[in-house]
Amino acid sequence: MRKALAALALVAVIGTGCASSAAKAAGSNTVLRLGVFPNLTHAPALVGISKGIIQKDLGANTKLKIFTFTSGSEASNAMLAGSIDATYIGPGPTTSLFSKSGKIAVVSGVTQGVASLVVRTGAGIISPADLAGKKVADPGVGNTQDVALKTWLHSNGLKTTDEGGNVTIVPLTKNSDSIQYFSGKQVDAAWLPEPYPSLLIAQGLGTKFLDERTLWPSGHFATTGLVVSTGYLTAHPDVVKNLVKGNVDSIRYIRSNPTQAEQIANTEIVTLGGKSLDAAPLAQAWAEMTFSWDPAAASLQQDAKNAASLGLIDSVPSNLLSVYKLDDLNAILKDLGLPAVPVPA
């Protein structure tokens, strides 16, 4: 009898846990918990938050609650834990999240094509071969730029020390640490998203060795996308559609008001705990970026193939392109009289 009662109690606990997990995933239609980074590559989010564009599109019945992260892994863990409902995030973490849970959806593109390999002034790097025996910084293992860097090294006959090669990868706690690492000669190069290449160059600490856009067809590759949990999408489709509209309207504002948007994004970075950018590198970085609701799906698939070949993920999910749920986006674009984004298949 006691064993039977214990078994029933265990089932009850498991059932309660499952219900709790499901409730977390479903979230609430009265609050949307949105992840964002104090990075310039998240400018549509920064502008949308500061100008109240996203909140306006969500409506009076849904409160926007912002969660700030400094890395894709932090945001990914929050998504997996059900602590947030949606986040702005790069393609590397997106693929990893989808591989782990399958319970996320990319509902819109955000930013394309803004990363470069910068070499430190005086490091003596004039060809890829010169990186042998050198230290190269990037935002962290499995990050979008980490995948790009290691793939490029392989294409040039180089390997990291973890792979038995002689290029040491130095993961950064924060991308802004690259300034200190360059000035202190702690690293010889860095593969980073904007604005950090522009900052390093503006301060005379480095020179641009490679613009990642040159490695992609037509120079288009995803840097940031808008991702939601499928649990939240299923439970609150109207809220998600309003969020997508907020993202589209934020990008439209940036396109119509580029100078004002540049300053708004810079100010919001500080509000969210980041550092303000000086005028010259800010302007240079801003000019490098393309803000688009097109998620550049082909680049996500290639990123996943690259990550798999590097052993960063076990394999490319056969259904990876199903991560794109663009019906809401295309309905919004149709209402605005704008061309639809092709749905990956």
Features from the language model and the residues they span:
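Mature, folded catalytic cores of secreted/periplasmic enzymes
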Residues: I66, M79, L131, V136, ...
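Soluble non-cytosolic domains of exported or imported proteins
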Residues: T70-S73, Y88, P139-V147, S176, ...
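Pocket-lining segment of extracytoplasmic ligand-binding domains
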Residues: G92-P93, E163-N166, K174-V270
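Secondary-structure end/capping motifs
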Residues: T234-S315
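Conserved C-terminal helix/tail region of periplasmic/extracytoplasmic solute-binding proteins
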Residues: K305-A345
